[in-house]
Structure formats: structure tokens, C-alpha cells
């Protein structure tokens, strides 16, 4: 069991090899956290989506440290966080009118825009690309940290590469204690999945990662529906694929357990179909998992389908949230996947949900967590 003491102290994890002490900052320590960043160190920071792993976005060395701390492939771009729209100007060649309109409509907020970078942005921060990913987070502490630091803060999710994203400071500590200088603790985040990413560097706005700013939201502001990158709708990546945004190329958000997603071809009657298929799967394949603890991820509205079976077979039920409140599911998803890791779950069977609105982001993360292991019903 790893120690966690919250804001205000130096913590050491005795169960991993440690190169440095990781200080836990509270909001009273914002000046000190900024000093660490100015000195070239790394500080995890809260946003409204997930916790980010912060470093100087204009420093080659800081970018390299971020990749090393996470174990992140160096061709996976970082997002630079700014505290206001005006800070974007020196970082890009130009700001297209439509991009400016999106900034004015959704910033601060969970929208990342990709634009052509200027010379001052090092390629170490962009995965070697001539574009840069930018956003202004909707979190008072992160905005204050950016202002105090005086430069854009590069910030991928503050977790080990490939594992579920951190939605609480304790999640960051679990993954990165001893690898970074500090964690700015602001409790649990609100949204729970990473920002929407829209590529505005070409002629046509293109969605690269779904998030809380939905396609419908973007369409309303732009007056046209953005294109959707083919990899988001099932197209396989070709050899040599170069990701323009985080979350595109590599397996992400994955628990240690095998995870299987059960999705309905048609929405009508999907709750009943999915629950019956999960029960059938356990009858057909259950003998393969006699030595494994099994968990079922379900909605509040459908947990009654599984309760008798769970009690009889010793299966753990994890309730993601309510089907008619998908934001409750995004808020809980990564926390629950981490709980499954902590509880030694070997197999996760999960319901699938509607991909309308923010459901597109929810299902994108769930499919990646399952490694695209999907059973259609």
C-alpha cells in the first residue's frame, strides 16, 4: 500500500526506486510550484479535465524530462497550456479567424486547438511536428500557475504512459512519486476525460480527439460540422502513422486487467441486450477465469440486472454513473479503472453506451482502455 498524505508535505514511496522527493503543494504554495517550473523542474497540476504533468513548454530539456518521467514515446505531442488568448500569438505563425472564434467561445475550457507553430516552440514539445497543440484550462489554480511561471506550461496527463489518466492528486502520486519534483493538489477534477482536440492547421477543421466540447458544440460555433479523423471511427492506422495529437497512436487509459466492452448495434433495447450478453459470456467463458477476480462496469439504471449474479459468483459491480447523465460516467471512468487495478481485478466486463454528445468521448476512452476488444450485440 502506498502512502498518501495530501497537500503540504514531502512524501516518499518506499515501494519504488526513487530519484527525488516529490513535494505535495497546496494552493498556498503556488509561488513555490512556479519556482520549481522556472528552475526546469516538473510539477503536476490540476485542470478541469485530468491532472497534467507540467514543465516549461519552451524548454527542450523540460520537454525531455516530461517524456522520461511518463515513459512516453517522443513522437506523441504535448499540449501547451496558456492563461489567456493573448499568450497564443508568439507561439504560432498566425491565428485563423475560426480558431479565434473557438477560443473566444470555449476558453478557458476543455478544447485544445492545433495550429502552425512559431520558431520559439521547440520540436521536443510538439513530437517533432511543425504544429503545436494549445489550450487554456478552466481551473483557477492552473491559470494562476501559468501566470506565475511566465511561460506556457507543457502538460500531458500526469500518469505513466498507457495507464488510466489521473483525476485526483493521489493518482499522480501513485504513478509519478520519485519521478517529478511536485504535485499541486486541488482535489478531484470535474470532467474526468481529456480535452477535445481540433486540428485548425489545415483548410478543414478536423476532430482528432473527442472530449467534453462535443461535435455539436463545435458545429454550432463554426457553422459547419468538423471532419472526424478516420482513426476515431474504426480505421486502422497505417505503418509509419505520425500522430498530430495526444491519444491517437498508442494504447491509452488501460487498466492492468483484460477489459471487454459489450456494445449494442441498435440503441433500442440495448440495456436488456447487453446485460443478457454479459451473463451469457460469463456462462460460456467463466471457466477460463476461475482464478481471476471479475468486475462488471455498469450504469446505475442497469445494476439490478447483475446484482443476483454478482452475489452468487463473487463478482464486483462498479457503477460508472447514470446513462442519462453521461458526464457522471466520464467523471468516474478513470477513477474506477484505477480502483480495479488496486483491487487486483483480472477481467473487466463493461457495458457500452450511446456515442451521442459527450458519449463519443466516453466511448473513445473505453474502447482504448479495452484495447478495442468489443463484442457487438
Where are these regions (language model features)?
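Active-site-adjacent structural elements in enzyme catalytic cores
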Residues: 14-377
Amino acid at each position: 500500500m502506498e502512502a498518501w498524505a495530501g497537500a503540504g508535505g514531502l512524501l516518499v514511496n518506499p515501494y519504488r526506486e526513487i530519484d527525488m522527493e516529490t513535494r505535495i503543494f497546496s494552493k498556498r504554495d503556488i509561488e513555490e510550484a512556479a519556482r520549481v517550473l522556472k528552475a526546469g523542474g516538473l510539477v503536476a497540476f490540476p485542470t478541469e479535465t485530468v491532472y497534467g504533468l507540467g514543465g516549461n513548454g519552451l524548454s527542450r530539456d523540460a520537454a525531455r524530462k516530461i517524456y522520461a518521467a511518463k515513459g512516453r514515446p517522443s513522437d506523441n505531442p504535448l499540449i501547451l497550456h496558456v492563461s489567456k488568448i493573448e499568450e497564443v500569438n508568439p507561439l504560432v505563425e498566425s491565428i485563423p479567424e475560426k480558431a479565434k472564434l473557438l477560443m473566444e467561445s470555449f476558453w478557458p475550457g476543455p478544447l485544445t486547438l492545433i495550429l502552425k507553430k512559431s520558431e520559439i516552440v521547440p520540436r521536443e514539445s510538439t513530437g517533432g511536428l511543425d504544429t503545436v497543440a494549445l489550450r487554456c484550462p478552466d481551473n483557477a489554480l492552473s491559470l494562476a500557475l501559468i501566470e506565475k511561471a511566465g511561460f506556457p506550461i507543457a502538460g500531458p496527463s500526469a500518469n505513466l504512459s498507457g495507464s488510466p489518466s489521473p483525476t485526483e492528486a493521489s493518482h499522480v502520486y501513485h504513478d509519478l512519486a520519485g519521478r517529478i519534483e511536485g504535485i499541486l493538489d486541488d482535489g478531484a477534477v470535474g470532467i474526468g476525460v481529456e480535452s477535445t482536440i481540433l486540428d485548425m492547421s489545415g483548410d478543414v477543421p478536423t476532430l482528432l480527439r473527442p472530449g467534453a466540447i462535443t461535435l455539436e458544440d463545435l458545429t454550432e460555433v463554426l457553422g459547419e460540422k468538423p471532419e472526424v479523423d478516420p482513426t476515431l471511427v474504426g480505421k486502422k492506422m497505417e505503418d509509419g502513422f505520425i500522430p498530430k495529437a495526444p491519444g491517437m497512436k498508442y494504447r491509452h487509459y488501460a487498466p492492468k486487467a483484460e477489459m471487454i466492452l459489450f456494445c449494442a448495434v441498435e440503441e433500442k433495447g440495448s440495456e436488456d441486450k447487453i446485460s443478457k450478453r454479459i451473463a451469457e459470456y460469463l456462462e460460456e467463458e467463466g471457466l477460463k477465469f476461475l482464478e481471476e477476480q471479475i468486475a462488471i462496469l455498469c450504469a446505475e439504471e442497469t445494476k439490478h440486472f447483475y446484482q443476483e449474479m454478482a452475489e452468487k459468483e463473487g463478482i464486483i459491480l462498479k457503477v460508472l454513473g447514470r446513462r442519462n447523465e453521461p458526464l457522471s460516467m466520464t467523471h468516474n471512468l478513470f477513477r474506477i479503472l484505477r480502483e480495479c487495478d488496486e483491487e487486483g481485478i483480472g477481467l473487466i466486463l463493461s457495458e457500452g453506451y450511446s456515442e451521442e454528445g459527450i458519449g463519443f468521448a466516453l466511448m473513445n476512452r473505453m474502447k482504448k482502455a479495452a484495447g478495442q476488444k468489443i463484442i457487438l450485440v
